[in-house]
């Protein structure tokens, strides 16, 4: 880590958010993967920026080791993963970036399971949410999905206006889903999840068909 830091910031991860104790919600985030940027190391302390809204954190090195083991993160390639020595290797145009994004989007839809959202909506309508699901959605997943769809909508505006419109619609629906989850109105939440599935299906058709 010290060697990497001599050449610039270092990305640490995946980390298990449940062990990041500077986050007041950490106790309900065990098993959620995360990444942070370390910009300095001073004796026994790391200085890092966390994109979850925690900038300039001073964290004891030993306090982050448990998160860094990532024992509950399925896709990890071992403990204590990090990336550093970053160098810019190419400067693609905005069109090239869009074309690569479109390719990745298509591949992920083709490789993914179908009708997952519909099945989940049906389960929510029939059974509501258990404690683990409720905590995940209230503190993490729906608000993150809203933000990510909004970012992608902005990116797509110059390349795919219809895709941008659908992504903005998805952002709005995920925002509403967050509120329904807070109210524990599971029939309303299920209805929104069905809507999300329908809009996502239309977005999928733009890239797969």
PLM feature segments, named:
Residues 123-209:
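Long non-globular sequence segments
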Residues 29, 41-147, 151-158:
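Noncatalytic regulatory segments and standalone regulatory/sensor domains
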Residues 1-90, 162-166, 175-179, 187-191, ...:
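Conserved active-site-adjacent core of cysteine acyl-enzyme catalytic domains
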């Amino acid at each position: 880590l010290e060697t990497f830091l001599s050449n610039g910031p270092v990305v640490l991860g995946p980390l298990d958010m449940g062990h990041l104790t500077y986050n007041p919600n950490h106790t309900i985030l065990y098993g959620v993967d995360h990444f942070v940027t370390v910009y300095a190391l001073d004796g026994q302390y790391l200085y890092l920026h966390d994109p979850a809204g925690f900038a300039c954190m001073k964290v004891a090195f030993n306090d982050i080791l448990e998160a860094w083991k990532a024992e509950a993160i399925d896709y990890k390639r071992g403990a204590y993963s990090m990336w550093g020595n970053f160098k810019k290797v190419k400067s693609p145009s905005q069109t090239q970036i869009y074309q690569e994004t479109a390719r990745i989007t298509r591949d992920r839809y083709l490789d993914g399971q179908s009708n997952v959202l519909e099945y989940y909506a049906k389960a929510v309508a029939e059974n509501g949410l258990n404690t683990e699901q409720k905590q995940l959605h209230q503190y993490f997943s729906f608000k993150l999905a809203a933000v990510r769809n909004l970012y992608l909508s902005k990116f797509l505006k110059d390349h795919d206006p219809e895709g941008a419109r659908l992504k903005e619609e998805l952002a709005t629906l995920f925002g509403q889903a967050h509120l329904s989850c807070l109210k524990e109105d599971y029939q309303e939440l299920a209805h929104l999840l069905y809507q999300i599935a329908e809009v996502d299906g239309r977005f999928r058709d733009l890239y797969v068909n």
